[in-house]
Amino acid sequence: MNAMQPPQSIEEIKAGLETTEKGGVRQSIRNCLTVFQRDPLLSGAIAYNILTDRKDIIKPIGFHRESTALNDTDMKYLLLYLEETYGLTNEKKIDNAIGIVANENKYHPIRDYLSSLVWDGKERIRFCLRHFLGADADDYTYEALKLFLMGAISRAFQIGRAHV
């Protein structure tokens, strides 16, 4: 499969689409995929959220949205855009292309956030419960909170893990 392509102009994308013998745009998954990978508005917009097990729209695509999760209204807007801009009208093939693009662009918001953090060297676990709850700052409290936090973090990285 072609991975994410750099965005191109709409005219360049149209020129690269497969056509029928009569010169119309071929209603194919490949054409839909090409549009989702190269269109300046749609390129990089759809991703699979591993945490929620849903397809998300992760960047603005020209209409108001309440949530990142791809919903029926979003599909209608996408269908309208593809029909008006590229002449692509086969809903099933468009949906299949969305599935492929989302699968190629997976993310996990918690893992991504945790992986982006850089430790500044300050010891926080030892004094966290004392600061917020007034607990003793002893070795037992430290080890208990450390175990709890390590378990929470390991669950984000190893799906289904019950404990450390």
Indicate where each model-derived feature is located.
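N-terminal nucleic-acid engagement/recognition segments and initiation subdomains in replication
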Residues: M1-R124, D138-E143
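Solvent-exposed, amphipathic alpha-helical segments
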Residues: Y113, C128-H131, R155
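A short, surface-exposed helix-loop junction/capping segment
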Residues: R124-D136
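N-terminal pre-Walker A segment at the start of P-loop NTPase domains
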Residues: D136-F157
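Conserved small/polar residues in nucleotide/adenosyl-binding loops
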Residues: A162-V164
